[in-house]
Amino acid sequence: IRIAKECVKFNERCFVRLLGDMRSYNYVVDITPDIEGSQYRMRAIDFDQQSYEGRSSFYQPKYFKENNPIIFLGQEHMNVPTMVQYQMEERSLIANRIKASMRRTNNLFKVMVKDQISNPEKVAQLREELSYHHKTDVFDQCDSMGSLVYENLKLVLAKDFKQSTTTFDFPRIE
Protein backbone atom coordinates (compact mmCIF):
# COMPACT_ATOMS: atom_id res chain seq x y z
CA ILE A 1 0.00 0.00 0.00
CA ARG A 2 2.92 2.37 0.66
CA ILE A 3 4.06 2.14 -2.95
CA ALA A 4 0.50 2.89 -4.14
CA LYS A 5 0.39 5.89 -1.77
CA GLU A 6 3.67 7.15 -3.21
CA CYS A 7 2.29 6.69 -6.73
CA VAL A 8 -0.60 9.04 -5.92
CA LYS A 9 1.86 11.59 -4.54
CA PHE A 10 4.22 11.20 -7.52
CA ASN A 11 1.34 11.73 -9.93
CA GLU A 12 0.47 14.93 -8.06
CA ARG A 13 4.08 16.20 -8.08
CA CYS A 14 4.36 15.62 -11.83
CA PHE A 15 1.04 17.27 -12.64
CA VAL A 16 1.58 20.30 -10.41
CA ARG A 17 4.89 21.14 -12.08
CA LEU A 18 3.95 19.77 -15.53
CA LEU A 19 6.68 17.14 -15.71
CA GLY A 20 5.71 14.79 -18.52
CA ASP A 21 6.43 11.31 -19.84
CA MET A 22 6.85 9.62 -16.47
CA ARG A 23 6.56 6.07 -17.73
CA SER A 24 8.02 3.39 -15.48
CA TYR A 25 11.44 3.66 -17.16
CA ASN A 26 11.72 7.43 -16.60
CA TYR A 27 11.69 7.34 -12.81
CA VAL A 28 13.26 5.31 -10.02
CA VAL A 29 11.82 4.14 -6.73
CA ASP A 30 14.05 5.14 -3.84
CA ILE A 31 13.58 2.68 -0.97
CA THR A 32 14.61 3.77 2.52
CA PRO A 33 14.39 1.28 5.39
CA ASP A 34 12.66 2.56 8.51
CA ILE A 35 11.27 1.24 11.77
CA GLU A 36 7.93 0.21 10.23
CA GLY A 37 9.34 -1.44 7.11
CA SER A 38 10.35 0.68 4.13
CA GLN A 39 9.57 4.14 2.82
CA TYR A 40 9.17 4.56 -0.95
CA ARG A 41 9.83 7.69 -2.96
CA MET A 42 9.41 7.89 -6.73
CA ARG A 43 11.97 10.19 -8.30
CA ALA A 44 12.08 11.38 -11.88
CA ILE A 45 15.30 10.68 -13.77
CA ASP A 46 14.31 12.05 -17.18
CA PHE A 47 13.42 15.73 -17.45
CA ASP A 48 13.36 16.28 -21.22
CA GLN A 49 9.55 16.52 -21.25
CA GLN A 50 9.26 19.27 -18.65
CA SER A 51 6.44 21.61 -19.75
CA TYR A 52 6.56 20.83 -23.47
CA GLU A 53 3.51 18.78 -24.52
CA GLY A 54 -0.01 20.07 -25.04
CA ARG A 55 -2.01 17.19 -23.54
CA SER A 56 -2.63 17.48 -19.80
CA SER A 57 -2.78 13.66 -19.46
CA PHE A 58 0.88 13.57 -20.55
CA TYR A 59 1.76 15.13 -17.18
CA GLN A 60 -0.02 12.45 -15.15
CA PRO A 61 1.89 9.17 -14.81
CA LYS A 62 -1.36 7.34 -14.06
CA TYR A 63 -2.29 7.51 -17.76
CA PHE A 64 0.70 5.54 -19.07
CA LYS A 65 0.03 1.84 -19.60
CA GLU A 66 3.58 1.07 -18.44
CA ASN A 67 2.48 2.21 -14.98
CA ASN A 68 -0.69 0.06 -14.92
CA PRO A 69 0.52 -2.56 -12.40
CA ILE A 70 1.15 0.04 -9.72
CA ILE A 71 -2.00 1.99 -10.63
CA PHE A 72 -4.14 -1.14 -10.34
CA LEU A 73 -2.55 -1.86 -6.96
CA GLY A 74 -3.67 1.58 -5.79
CA GLN A 75 -7.18 1.08 -7.15
CA GLU A 76 -7.41 -2.21 -5.32
CA HIS A 77 -6.20 -1.00 -1.91
CA MET A 78 -7.24 2.66 -1.63
CA ASN A 79 -10.54 4.49 -1.78
CA VAL A 80 -11.09 7.92 -3.32
CA PRO A 81 -11.05 9.91 -0.04
CA THR A 82 -7.69 8.33 0.84
CA MET A 83 -6.24 9.26 -2.57
CA VAL A 84 -7.49 12.83 -2.19
CA GLN A 85 -5.90 12.99 1.28
CA TYR A 86 -2.52 11.96 -0.18
CA GLN A 87 -2.87 14.54 -2.95
CA MET A 88 -3.56 17.26 -0.40
CA GLU A 89 -0.60 16.12 1.73
CA GLU A 90 1.68 16.36 -1.30
CA ARG A 91 0.37 19.82 -2.19
CA SER A 92 1.12 20.95 1.35
CA LEU A 93 4.70 19.63 1.11
CA ILE A 94 5.20 21.37 -2.25
CA ALA A 95 3.86 24.64 -0.83
CA ASN A 96 6.26 24.43 2.12
CA ARG A 97 9.21 23.79 -0.22
CA ILE A 98 8.27 26.80 -2.31
CA LYS A 99 7.94 29.02 0.77
CA ALA A 100 11.39 27.89 1.91
CA SER A 101 12.95 28.88 -1.42
CA MET A 102 10.72 31.74 -2.55
CA ARG A 103 13.46 33.91 -4.05
CA ARG A 104 14.91 31.07 -6.14
CA THR A 105 11.43 30.03 -7.27
CA ASN A 106 10.54 33.59 -8.31
CA ASN A 107 13.80 33.92 -10.25
CA LEU A 108 13.12 30.64 -12.03
CA PHE A 109 9.61 31.71 -13.04
CA LYS A 110 10.83 35.10 -14.28
CA VAL A 111 12.92 33.21 -16.82
CA MET A 112 10.37 30.46 -17.56
CA VAL A 113 7.49 32.78 -18.46
CA LYS A 114 9.66 34.54 -21.06
CA ASP A 115 11.21 31.39 -22.55
CA GLN A 116 9.70 29.64 -25.58
CA ILE A 117 9.78 26.13 -24.12
CA SER A 118 7.19 24.79 -26.57
CA ASN A 119 5.35 25.83 -29.70
CA PRO A 120 2.22 28.04 -29.62
CA GLU A 121 -0.12 25.18 -30.63
CA LYS A 122 0.90 23.06 -27.65
CA VAL A 123 0.65 26.04 -25.31
CA ALA A 124 -2.89 26.72 -26.59
CA GLN A 125 -3.91 23.08 -26.22
CA LEU A 126 -2.56 22.79 -22.67
CA ARG A 127 -4.10 26.14 -21.72
CA GLU A 128 -7.50 24.83 -22.83
CA GLU A 129 -7.08 21.43 -21.14
CA LEU A 130 -5.91 22.93 -17.84
CA SER A 131 -8.85 25.35 -17.87
CA TYR A 132 -11.22 22.43 -18.42
CA HIS A 133 -9.52 20.21 -15.82
CA HIS A 134 -9.52 22.86 -13.10
CA LYS A 135 -12.85 24.42 -14.14
CA THR A 136 -11.40 27.94 -14.22
CA ASP A 137 -10.33 30.66 -16.64
CA VAL A 138 -7.08 31.66 -14.88
CA PHE A 139 -5.09 30.17 -17.76
CA ASP A 140 -6.76 32.28 -20.48
CA GLN A 141 -4.04 34.94 -20.46
CA CYS A 142 -1.11 32.48 -20.43
CA ASP A 143 0.97 32.64 -23.60
CA SER A 144 3.92 30.43 -22.64
CA MET A 145 4.50 27.09 -20.97
CA GLY A 146 6.27 28.92 -18.15
CA SER A 147 3.19 31.00 -17.42
CA LEU A 148 1.02 27.84 -17.53
CA VAL A 149 3.30 26.11 -15.01
CA TYR A 150 3.25 29.19 -12.81
CA GLU A 151 -0.56 29.50 -12.84
CA ASN A 152 -1.02 25.74 -12.39
CA LEU A 153 1.29 25.76 -9.38
CA LYS A 154 -0.38 28.83 -7.92
CA LEU A 155 -3.84 27.37 -8.41
CA VAL A 156 -3.22 23.89 -7.05
CA LEU A 157 -1.38 25.20 -4.04
CA ALA A 158 -4.04 27.77 -3.19
CA LYS A 159 -5.39 27.05 0.25
CA ASP A 160 -8.67 25.13 0.12
CA PHE A 161 -8.45 24.48 -3.66
CA LYS A 162 -9.84 20.96 -3.96
CA GLN A 163 -11.92 20.81 -7.12
CA SER A 164 -9.13 19.40 -9.27
CA THR A 165 -8.11 16.54 -7.03
CA THR A 166 -8.10 13.56 -9.33
CA THR A 167 -8.56 9.89 -8.67
CA PHE A 168 -7.35 6.70 -10.25
CA ASP A 169 -10.83 5.61 -11.31
CA PHE A 170 -10.26 5.64 -15.08
CA PRO A 171 -10.72 2.81 -17.58
CA ARG A 172 -7.96 0.25 -17.68
CA ILE A 173 -5.49 0.70 -20.51
CA GLU A 174 -4.44 -2.65 -21.88
What are these regions (language model features)?
Residues I35-E174:
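C-terminal catalytic region of ATP-dependent kinase domains
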Residues I1-Y59:
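Conserved kinase catalytic-core segment
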